[in-house]
């Protein structure tokens, strides 16, 4: 039986590709989670209840599937995706180039001014949720919404929950920002 030896550079290439895709996992403990079709449909249903024009940001947009789909569905809105994994950012940026109301920024979610948006969407991990909640409370305007796919904010009941039941995605959890006197 003959053994095929792979060139050493293939292993290095594989490592570099994994690093370029999983950059967030190392620093932020947020792996790549892509929103499924049912989650996108539930987001579309929810956004159709909002007053246009709408400003929406996807924190950690991956390949921009969700933000691009929503931008196509709601042409009067402004849709922004932020991503720090280099390869995912490049793919997302290329996908959104021709969609006028969609833009992708190479930026950490912690550098985004959440007050610019009516809806802030994320599909992160349990690790950053409390920190994100503190950031949302400090920056988001009264009446704006924070939406998390699957991951709840510990100790903070959602104002609304939309069932997704698709693979590992269970629900969209929605919190409406209240005025400072109510927090």
What are these regions (language model features)?
Residues 1-21:
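N-terminal auxiliary segments of SAM/dcSAM-dependent transferases
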Residues 27-139, 145:
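Membrane-proximal soluble helical/coiled-coil segments
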Residues 128-183:
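C-terminal substrate-binding/active-site "lid" region of AdoMet-derived donor-dependent transferases
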């Amino acid at each position: 039986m003959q053994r095929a030896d792979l060139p050493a550079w293939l292993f290095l290439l594989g490592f570099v590709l994994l690093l370029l895709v999983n950059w967030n996992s190392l620093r932020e403990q947020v792996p790549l989670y892509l929103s499924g079709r049912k989650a996108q449909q539930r987001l579309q249903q929810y956004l159709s209840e909002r007053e246009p024009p709408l400003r929406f940001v996807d924190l950690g947009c991956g390949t921009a599937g969700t933000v691009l789909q929503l931008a196509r569905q709601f042409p009067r809105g402004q849709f922004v995706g932020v991503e720090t994994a280099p390869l995912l950012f490049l793919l997302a940026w290329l996908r959104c180039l021709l969609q006028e109301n969609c833009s992708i920024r190479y930026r950490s979610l912690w550098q985004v001014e959440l007050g610019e948006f009516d809806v802030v969407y994320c599909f992160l991990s349990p690790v950053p949720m409390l920190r994100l909640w503190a950031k949302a409370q400090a920056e988001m305007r009264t009446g704006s919404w924070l939406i998390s796919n699957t991951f709840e904010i510990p100790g903070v009941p959602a104002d609304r929950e939309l069932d997704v039941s698709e693979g590992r995605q269970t629900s969209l959890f929605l919190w409406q920002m209240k005025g400072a006197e109510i927090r």
